[in-house]
């Protein structure tokens, strides 16, 4: 409304105009402008087709016992078809999704539930957004859905920390490997490829000609030429996908890395972060607008938690190349990896009570190392270069490159980027390269505080070190050490892969009676996290380098942390793609890289008869193959195998724990991974 009034006043009430308007006439014209704006808004609301509002809630009073509304499975299938029809037949039109808990309106009458039909009015009048008659708008009513896919049985060999006598020593003893070994059985699906249409993505980036494209285009000046010569697939690659399930919106949100290279996918010149949305069936949705919380905008519309401070909403559009501020110099590219590396997406719970997706990534930047000035105030500034760890709040923004550039730069100060912050080790101790980390959230801290105040990193996987970093503000505060096994520092060959999922949180989300046997046995003060690391083995018997996932189980007992289990290479029956499509599997790199855990749910087993159904857990995680794919793999029964199998569960749930100084299980896992590589090379 303010924008409309300003525009109206500028056009009709310019004081420099030859037409001298009286104050009375100005007021009349202002009133006329307000009337016209209201009339136009009303016409949009009235004329907007009810066919483009998915039916659902009606206006009913709400109470403290209000629970989020979701449609039944039959209705959800019907709504899904409507959305897919709209995506297919209304190209270029938006699909606008309000969160499921967008329900409370507070006014002089009290609180009531906003009708679905009122979403249009809110969007046009309160948010002051334009609406096309063919746009589709709805409040989410979709719940998570497992795909109906085949599974095959797979074995995973793991090595425990020793747990019992002799486990608390940093001296590795691989003679113990057979004794520490245990094998679990899970089931895994084939890899489902989710790569986007790079030609479409880059064409949109080129045609939109955003400030971000104009800023970075010197790194890929031949983009138009690549279209003309049809060589996009020789210079551009998409990989390293990481996703989260947005429960309030009923969609998967994915970030992936898109690189430009002059040679092949192993020599990137610049990296971009690409954000896109998939429905619950893993079908990509185009031109999707999510109505997300905006804590900077206080509003009378709130989420269901009446104890939280009211906040407004704003819209974010997907798919998009994320405008993340990065340091770059197109005149100095040798040996530098500019842009966004290894992006991971994770959900944090904010102080306002809602879940917010954030990105964790590495990026090349510089920091001032020395300043030299003479008496005439002329001098020289020296810089050190780093590949550091950052967080990006993708639903929040900042102007310019604060928290990145130390020198003022007027060229970028008015650009609106995603809000970022660098994570720095204690005592401002930046490592030259911060790439080998595994992210996790402390669930007990969330329960005690009601929100997440920190994120945690397994910063070094062998001779374990845990870093704790604040996310409550955007100040460049130093992180602090949560745990250090010892003073040994070396990244080693076991690197971070996916984030780690908190098992306590996973169990807490479900009330199946079958889970009580696990919940009741978890000792007080004990937390578990599970995810996939990745070992990088050079010249081990297949190509110059082999990567595979390594399952890891992180345990916290009191104030101490350890890897209770580390597995050798895990294949999971996933098809391998050769680095060079016209050559063998052991030419150059042979890899499966785990990137992120998309979801982990506990359901009634879909593959059993109704009367025989038991609870089963399903993990979805993303991988990359040949640094050129974005794939999703489902693993069935991993939680069950870890916590109900007689061997592993006995160790994980034991009250007395040792092994907090042991690295033997890591060495055993790496030793057997090398054996895996050698046998694989002899086979292929």
Curated annotation (Swiss-Prot):
GO MF entry, a single one: mannosyltransferase activity
Positions of transmembrane segments: 29-49
Key words of the record: Cell wall biogenesis/degradation, Glycoprotein, Glycosyltransferase, Membrane, Signal-anchor, Transferase, Transmembrane, Transmembrane helix, Virulence
Pfam families: BMT
Record carries keyword Transcription: no
Stretches in topological domain Extracellular: 50-684
InterPro entries recorded: BMT1
Recorded coiled-coil stretches: none
Compartment(s) where it occurs, according to its Swiss-Prot or TrEMBL record: Membrane
Key word tRNA processing present: no
GO cellular component, one term: membrane
GO terms of biological process kind: beta-1,2-oligomannoside biosynthetic process; beta-1,2-oligomannoside metabolic process; cell wall organization; protein O-linked mannosylation
Deleted gene: phenotype: Impairs the mannosylation of beta-mannose chains on the acid-stable fraction of cell wall phosphopeptidomannan.
Function: Beta-mannosyltransferase involved in cell wall biosynthesis. Required for addition of the first beta-mannose residue to acid-stable fraction of cell wall phosphopeptidomannan. Plays a key role in reducing host inflammatory response.
Protein's UniProt name: Beta-mannosyltransferase 1
Provenance organism: Candida albicans (strain SC5314 / ATCC MYA-2876) (Yeast)
């Amino acid at each position: 409304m303010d924008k409309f009034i300003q525009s109206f006043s500028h056009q009709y009430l310019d004081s420099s105009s030859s037409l001298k308007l009286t104050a009375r006439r100005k007021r009349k014209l202002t009133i006329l402008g307000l009337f016209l704006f209201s009339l136009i808004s009303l016409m949009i609301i009235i004329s907007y087709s009810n066919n483009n509002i998915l039916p659902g809630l009606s206006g009913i009073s709400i109470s403290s016992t209000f629970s989020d509304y979701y449609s039944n499975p039959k209705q959800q299938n019907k709504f899904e078809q409507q959305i897919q029809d709209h995506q297919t037949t209304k190209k270029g039109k938006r699909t606008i999704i309000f969160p499921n808990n967008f329900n409370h309106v507070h006014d002089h009458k009290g609180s009531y539930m906003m009708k679905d039909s009122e979403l249009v009015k809110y969007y046009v009048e309160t948010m002051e957004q334009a609406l096309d008659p063919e746009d589709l708008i709805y409040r989410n009513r979709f719940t998570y859905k497992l795909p109906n896919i085949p599974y095959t049985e797979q074995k995973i060999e793991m090595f425990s920390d020793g747990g019992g006598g002799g486990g608390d020593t940093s001296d590795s003893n691989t003679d113990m490997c057979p004794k520490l070994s245990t094998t679990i059985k899970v089931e895994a699906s084939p890899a489902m490829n989710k790569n986007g249409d790079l030609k479409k993505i880059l064409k949109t980036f080129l045609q939109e000609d955003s400030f971000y494209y104009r800023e970075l285009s010197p790194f890929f000046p031949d983009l138009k030429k690549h279209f003309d010569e049809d060589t996009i697939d020789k210079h551009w690659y998409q990989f390293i996908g990481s996703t989260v399930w947005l429960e309030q919106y009923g969609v998967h949100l994915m970030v992936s890395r898109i690189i430009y290279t002059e040679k092949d996918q192993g020599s990137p010149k610049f990296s971009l972060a690409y954000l896109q949305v998939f429905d619950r069936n893993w079908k990509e949705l185009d031109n999707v607008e999510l109505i997300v919380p905006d804590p900077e905008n206080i509003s009378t519309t709130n989420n269901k938690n009446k104890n939280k401070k009211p906040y407004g909403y704003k819209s974010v559009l997907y798919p998009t190349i994320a405008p993340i501020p990065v340091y770059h110099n197109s005149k100095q590219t040798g040996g530098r990896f500019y842009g966004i590396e290894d992006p991971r997406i994770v959900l944090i719970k904010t102080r306002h009570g809602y879940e917010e997706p954030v990105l964790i990534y590495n990026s090349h930047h510089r920091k001032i190392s020395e300043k030299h000035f003479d008496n005439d105030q002329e001098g020289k500034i020296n810089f050190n270069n780093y590949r550091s760890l950052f967080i990006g709040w993708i639903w929040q923004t900042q102007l310019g490159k604060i928290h990145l550039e130390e020198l003022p730069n007027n060229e970028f100060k008015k650009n609106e980027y995603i809000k970022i912050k660098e994570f720095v080790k204690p005592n401002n101790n930046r490592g030259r390269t911060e790439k080998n980390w595994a992210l996790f959230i402390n669930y007990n801290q969330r329960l005690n505080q009601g929100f997440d105040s920190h994120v945690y990193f397994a910063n070094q996987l062998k001779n374990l070190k845990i870093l704790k970093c604040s996310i409550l503000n955007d100040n460049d505060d130093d992180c602090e050490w949560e745990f250090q096994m010892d003073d040994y520092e070396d990244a080693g060959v076991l690197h971070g892969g996916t984030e780690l999922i908190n098992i306590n949180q996973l169990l807490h989300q479900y009330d199946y009676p079958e889970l009580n046997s696990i919940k009741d046995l978890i000792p007080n003060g004990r937390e578990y996290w599970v995810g996939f690391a990745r070992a990088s083995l050079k010249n081990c018997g297949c190509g110059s380098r082999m990567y595979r996932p390594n399952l890891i189980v992180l345990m916290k007992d009191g104030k101490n942390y350890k890897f209770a289990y580390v597995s050798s290479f895990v294949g999971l029956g996933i098809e391998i793609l050769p680095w060079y499509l016209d050559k063998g599997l052991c030419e150059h790199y042979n890899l499966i890289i785990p990137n992120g855990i998309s979801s982990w749910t506990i359901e009634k087993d879909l593959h059993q008869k109704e009367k025989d159904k038991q609870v089963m857990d399903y993990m979805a995680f993303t991988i990359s193959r040949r640094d050129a794919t974005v794939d999703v793999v489902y693993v069935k029964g991993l939680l069950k195998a870890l916590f109900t199998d007689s061997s592993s569960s006995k160790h994980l749930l034991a009250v007395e724990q040792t092994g907090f100084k042991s690295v033997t299980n890591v060495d055993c896992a790496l030793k057997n991974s090398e054996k895996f590589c050698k046998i694989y090379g002899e086979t292929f």
